[in-house]
UniProtKB/Swiss-Prot annotation:
It comes from the Bacteria. The keyword Transit peptide does not apply. Keywords: Aminoacyl-tRNA synthetase, ATP-binding, Cytoplasm, Ligase, Nucleotide-binding, Protein biosynthesis. It is found in: Cytoplasm. GO terms for molecular function: ATP binding; glutamate-tRNA ligase activity; tRNA binding. This is Glutamate--tRNA ligase 2. Its EC number is 6.1.1.17. SUPFAM superfamilies: An anticodon-binding domain of class I aminoacyl-tRNA synthetases, Nucleotidylyl transferase. It comes from Bartonella henselae (strain ATCC 49882 / DSM 28221 / CCUG 30454 / Houston 1) (Rochalimaea henselae).
Amino acid sequence: MIKVRFAPSPTGYIHIGNIRIALFNWLYAQAHNGTFILRYDNTDVERSKQEYIDAIAVDLEWLGIQPDEIYYQSKRFNRYDEVAEILKQRGLLYPCYETAEELDRRRKIQLSRKLPPVYDRAALKLTPEKKREFETQGRKPHWRFLLPNFENDPLQKKRTEVCWNDAVKGKQTIDLASLSDPVLIREDGSYLYTLPSVVDDIDMAITHIIRGDDHITNTGAQIALFEALNAKLPTFGHINLLTTLLGKGLSKRNNDLSIHSLRADGFESIAVQCLAVLIGTSQNVHPYPNQAVLLEHFNLQDTSRSVAKFDIADLLTLNSHFVHELTYEEVKKRLENLSINGEKVECFWNAIRSNINKVNDAVLWWKMLHDEQNFDTVALEDRAFVRQSLNLLPEGTLNEESWKVWTVALKEKTGRRGKALFMPLRQALTGMDHGPEMGKILQLLGREKVIERLIIQGE
């Protein structure tokens, strides 16, 4: 049975790049009747926050992702300690006492000599006396995993290829001799990503690990750790990364691209899903109506080899497709939450929806119709025409037909036509050069407000 996982770190709001990984895993599980696990990577107890755990849960629910199982790494420290002890007893996890400054100095020396900045396993040469001396000085060891890239002497590395058939990129090869032994445990005893992740993947019987291709190099070391623990290897699949237009990686520090902020800004869930899943693939980004249809077009092998660049303008364009199709009943509650209510709200929505990119944009049009306006958009040469238009405004309650009657009368009286006829009236009544049909604007403003604005803008 297919079993995948999404393992976010709750140290901030997750962004569209994170959720892209979640959606790939979720859709893959759905396509194969598999199981989707949500695993919170919260071993960093200082930076992990409950508010972000809660936010991730809300984000996933908003995107239609329903985890089958939920785990917290912070509740599994005893298990990680147990595995770490096994590795120590087998000599596969060894203590190192170098400070960060010492390691940095070694890397700089290696680079100056045009050598790869790979850890030289100097800690393996330490005598028990030297270790005690470091301990007496107050140094605490960090612990490295001994990669199997040697025959008998770990100080004599040899080329050791680790190969796997990547579900996205095909055959991949990593030479373990080109890697530093990964640090699994920090000086303070806390765990870095690798050991808890591998132990969890083993214990939870994860069959497929689908993640960003920035993890490809890590995969070589992780495969070595899987094998050291006599575990069955999962299938790895590495998808291209999502970057900014400038090619920079997405960060939790950039809150503008967090799912939390995109949702608050009024983006549609399905728009975010379609862009996240289809960008950076051989498919066009298409506004599929729901997740079920998106699933029909999802194919892991369609992923491109090059990075995918995220442009908020693309998301806005895609979002507008969905907004223009939303009925009043579908947005009624959301409009109420935006303080848009009253007798004409349904008429208002039907008038403006094709002119907005997000539901939240309705607020701008609502304020334009109901608030006192101080816009000054009518050209001086058009103000006499605006004053004249007031005299030809149809009598009675204004409706959509009133616009046609009004403009025909103005055309006959003034000889104006086209833009010269319509634009000054639109500017006088809305302060804008574009927008909904003017017949609907007249109906929404009402006779009293139309007269008031024509008087002000004609002065």
